Every structure is written in C-alpha cells, then in structure tokens.
UniProtKB/Swiss-Prot annotation:
Binds 1 zinc ion per subunit. Coiled coil: none annotated. This is Histidinol dehydrogenase. The gene is hisD. Its cofactor is Zn(2+). Pfam families: Histidinol_dh. The keyword Metal-binding applies. One of its GO terms (biological process) is L-histidine biosynthetic process. Belongs to the histidinol dehydrogenase family. It comes from Dehalococcoides mccartyi (strain ATCC BAA-2266 / KCTC 15142 / 195).
Amino acid sequence: MEIIRGFAPAEKRLSRRDKAGFFLDETQRAELAKRLGVDPEKAVNGIIDDIRKQGDKAVLEYTLKFDRAAISKLEVSPAEIKQAAGEIPAELFEALKLAATQVRAYHHFQKEAVWKAAEIMQGKQLIRPLERVGLYVPGGKAFYPSTVLMTAIPAKEAGVDEIILVTPPGADGKIPAPTLAAAYIAGVDKVFACGGAQAVAALAFGTKSIPKVDKICGPGNIFVTLAKKAVFGVVDIDGLQGPSEVLILADQYANAEYCASDILAQAEHDVLASPIMVTTSAELAKRVNDIVETKAGSCARKDIIRQSLRDNGLIAVVDNMDEAIKLANMYATEHLCLLVKDSEQYLSRINHAGCIFYGEKASVVMGDYVAGPSHALPTSGTARFSSPLNILDFVKYIDIVNVSKEEVTKLGKAAVTIARAEGLECHAEAALKRME
C-alpha cells in the first residue's frame, strides 16, 4: 500500500476519488469507455429503450447475452423460493435468520421513533408507505443474500405493500439458493431472474411479467447505477452507489492486526474498492502495511486484493487527531472505523460518514452482516448529503392543511396581498371567497 506523510499530501490524494463513471467529465468518461470497450451511458440508454419497446422479450434476450442464461420465464415461483430455504446448509439458514432478526429489530426501533414523531405532528402530516418497491441484488458469478436482508427488511418494516426483487441468474438459469432463502426469510413478494440495466428498466417501466414499481433500491455495477440514474424521475431511487470504501482512523493504541484485517476485508470486495487508513502513528502505519503485504498473498481473492491495494489503497500519517478527523469529514466515507483510544468521544466531531464503527470489536464486517443497520450506505462522498438505507426510504409524507373560521381572515388577508404582489389575481380571488 502507498504510505504518505502529512495532512496536505493526504488531502490531495483523498480528493482524487474514483467516481465510478457517473460523475466523470467527458475526458474521463472517454477513458472509461475505452477501458470497458463500450460507452456505458450509451449502452444503458439503448438497453432502456429496448425494454420499453419490447418488454419481456428484450429482458430475456439481454439475460442470454450478458448472463449467458437461456431462460424462458423470468419469475421464480413461490414454491421454488420456499424450497431453497430448505436446501441451504442449516448453519447458513440460522445465520441468515439471526441477521434478519437484528436488521428487523433495528428498523422496528427506527419505525417506532418515526411514528412517534408523526403523532406529535397529528393533524399536520400523514405518513404513507410506498405501495410497490423494486430491490436490485447483485448476482451472477457471486451471490449476496445479506443484501436481500439489508434492503427488503427495512421496506417490510416500513409497511410497503409489495416487494419485488430482481437479481441476475447464473449461467444455469438459476438464482443461487442462499439468495432465494434470504428472500423467503425477509418476506419478499416476488423474485425475478434478471439483472443489469435491463432489470432496472423493467422495474421502472414495467413489462408483462415484471410490475412497475415506485422506487428502486440496491447496489450494482456501473451499468446498474447509470440505469438507476437514467430512470430517476420515472421512479424514485435510493441513490447512486459507487465502489465500496472504508476509512480507518487509528492512533498509537490501535491493534495493528485489527486494522490490517479490516483493510484486507475491504480490498476483497473488488478491484475498485478503497481501503484507507489515517493514523497519527508512523510506527503503526508500518506495522499495518507489513501485515497487509504478508497476508494478502495467502487470501483466496489475492489478485483482487492486490489490485485494490495497489490502485486505491492508502495509509496516511498525520500529526494529530484534529487533522485525522478533518480528513475523515472531507472524504465522507461509506464506512468509518474509529480504532482510537476513547473512541466514543470523537463521535460528536464526525459530520460525514455512511456508518461509524467505534470500539475495538466493531469490525466493518459486523455491519456488513449482523449489526442491524442496513449495509446499503452512501459512497463516493455522497455521505455529505445522504443517509444509509432505512425505513424513511420507503415512506412518504403528505402534508395536511386545515384553516379554521377564526384563522381565515388573518391568513387570507396575507394570502391576498402576496398573490397580488405576484400578479396572480385568481389566487387572490380564491382566498377572498373563503373570507366572505
């Protein structure tokens, strides 16, 4: 990993974050298109257009083209979903159930807090769950049952009427049993074997098989993300997720093995993942780097890890915790790990992060699977203005206005004055009628 010293060099290096293609200028976009062999935005727009015109037929054709899966139907039957729950190892099934319990409890607690606030606003505002939500779960060569739980359960707790899940099938045309088992545990209503931009388009516009949804949530590759960006406005989306990232703040008291294990876990995600550590200890920086370099070669995904560390890994050594926290807030990371003495005292100084892990035992991996909050977090600096996926993503607020006879004269007079100042005489007349 690259080790740099000093606040200014670290700030400059961290500001060069890869935006994964959806915030790039024309030159950067051209470079990305050359690397991928296709202009991703043009490809996505073409796919969306095909889905709008041809529906299921186009979805099936793209599933064959991109996933090499020759399937004749998109929907997975309820019987297949239930059957999958009995096919996976008992230990995995119990682990998924425990994770589901944790996620459900966390979001139920949040729901109670939100509904309590709504009671205070009684007569002023209504809360209504979205009717139908589409969840995108990455798949194909790998499978992510944890993402099913982390997206479906908050939607379920919020009261969404119908939860639709899309995920790419393998080359055999099937969705992995752990993914289906997680859908069963989470209470997903329908599952469709399709992925990529074509699945996003199908959710946004609807096909004969796949119903149109009100909102699309869940992470994916650059094509999925650009498709979500393109259909925003037709439907709502949770955000534009880029490559996964962690920033570890560590002082001289930090356990070097813990720091190294979290860095390796982050690098294991994919070659675009960003494992970052900012420390006040040059000695710790060297120890952590030595451990990472030694262990990386023995990991199952060593090639991915090494490329991630080479291209995006960084250890920055700064003078004090003030500088470290300033860098953390500037970077606005997806995962922020506080491996420092008395870590709780620094929580009030963190303004921008998707999720904060403090205390030695709070590994990011716990948040990935079993801590309770959703692991669907803002990335690429969007933690400066957005939040983790939660029940508020699956409800909407409706304001209520009622004006009493006692209020209408005072309020109406002001309304008439403002309406006439804006040159809207009919507005003024409507207010005057209520004042008669």
